[in-house]
Amino acid sequence: MKFDCAIIGGGLAGLLCGLALNQHGLRSVIISRGQSALHFSSASLDLLSALPNGDHVTDVAQGLQQLAEQLPEHPYSRLGAEAVLKYATQTEALLAACGAVMQGDARRPHRRVTPLGTLRPAWLSPLEVPVAPLPSQGACLVGISGFADFQPHLAAAALGQHGVTAAAVEIELPLLDVLRDNPTEFRAANIARVLDDENMWPALHAALLPLAQQYDLLIMPACFGLADDRLYHWLQARLPCPLRLLPTLPPSVPGMRLHSQLQRQFIREGGAWLAGDEVVKISHRQDAVEAVWTRNHGDIALRPRFTVLASGSFFSNGLVATRDSVREPILGLDLHQTLPRESWYQRDFFASQPWQRFGVKTDALLRPLLGGQPFHNLFAIGSLLGGFDAIQLGCGGGVCAVTALHAARQIHALAGGRP
């Protein structure tokens, strides 16, 4: 099977790379083992929230310049501030084309409300997510009776520390009784499958209406809208006060919807999607990938002109750890790695952990190294890359997006298109 590009991994980085290649007229295939980390995410993306020295970033352009001085091995530092901001802007347009309506600005982070009521910097957030500043009075956090993945009283207390006085109430929704018999079924994704039925919308509206008449803002868990945001806009049009939604503990409905929107657009534009498959071997000669072999296709190889590794970090098995080593399991690529094992972590749980910086080494074009030499038609993107701590710096989503679009641009140029 011949393709212009084979993308290994169907998460945020892989999908954005595939979508960008579609726009360049290149035919690509994504090999996906299963659910990506997007299913467990809030669907908010961060670009750069903090610097290695602990300073908070309020101006991203300036922060990128400081990052290059403090952490030259960071993917942003290698690409340059101008390129990072350009790719971030292109990502916003890509997401909008997929129907993912976001709020935010690449140059200046906003602060979104988390499920625990804290404020966290973000680059892009779904339109329904509450962001600062919130009204100091008149907000109400609405829980669902029996739903343990969102605690309105805890969130209200945390918002109080930020000067927001919010009430906390729970609503009864008898239509969800079918899920209550088994606590493991009473999760956001399963609730959404019930509430997304248009026949159930009036019952949810009836439960929220008395609160909407009493308060100036309602904030409830994001437990509807798996496929689209029709119910959210339907409620917005009928409630007398604004409604906002908070992502819950995983699986996250906004994250699942974002993944679905990107995947549908990729396939709609002609991309191929190999679901539930896994790459077991990549054949290469000297510095060129020749074939990609998957578990489900046996002796039928994919023969792409270019290959992109978007297989993720430890969470997605893009990296595998043993007792004394970490490796990239498909090719055994060179890694950023700290040895010995005792130095993989710090005893302070909340400190930046060295293992978070493990990942594949690449050249300036994001081509991974094997024995110190890059492949000329293989690229690595997203959280598989090493040299940075995405949690400490608040840059995980941004690295996925920026490196995905950079790799797509390199492939387009090498394939004969204009750079």
Curated annotation (Swiss-Prot):
GO molecular function terms attached to this record: glycerol-3-phosphate dehydrogenase (quinone) activity
Domain of life of the source: Bacteria
Protein's UniProt keywords contain Nucleotidyltransferase: no
Pathway: Polyol metabolism; glycerol degradation via glycerol kinase pathway; glycerone phosphate from sn-glycerol 3-phosphate (anaerobic route): step 1/1
One GO CC term on file: glycerol-3-phosphate dehydrogenase (FAD) complex
Reaction(s) the record says it catalyses: a quinone + sn-glycerol 3-phosphate = dihydroxyacetone phosphate + a quinol
Alphabetical list of InterPro entries matching this protein: FAD-dep_OxRdtase_2_FAD-bd, FAD/NAD-bd_sf, G3P_DH_GlpB_su
UniProt enzyme class: oxidoreductase
Cofactor annotation: FMN
Gene3D superfamilies (alphabetical): FAD/NAD(P)-binding domain
A Pfam family the protein falls into: FAD_binding_2
SUPFAM superfamilies: FAD/NAD(P)-binding domain
EC number: 1.1.5.3
Keywords: Flavoprotein, FMN, Oxidoreductase
NCBIfam families: glycerol3P_GlpB (TIGR03378), PRK05329.1-1 (NF003718), PRK05329.1-2 (NF003719), PRK05329.1-3 (NF003720)
Homology family: Belongs to the anaerobic G-3-P dehydrogenase subunit B family.
Oligomeric and partner information: Composed of a catalytic GlpA/B dimer and of membrane bound GlpC.
Function: Conversion of glycerol 3-phosphate to dihydroxyacetone. Uses fumarate or nitrate as electron acceptor.
Protein name (Swiss-Prot/TrEMBL): Anaerobic glycerol-3-phosphate dehydrogenase subunit B
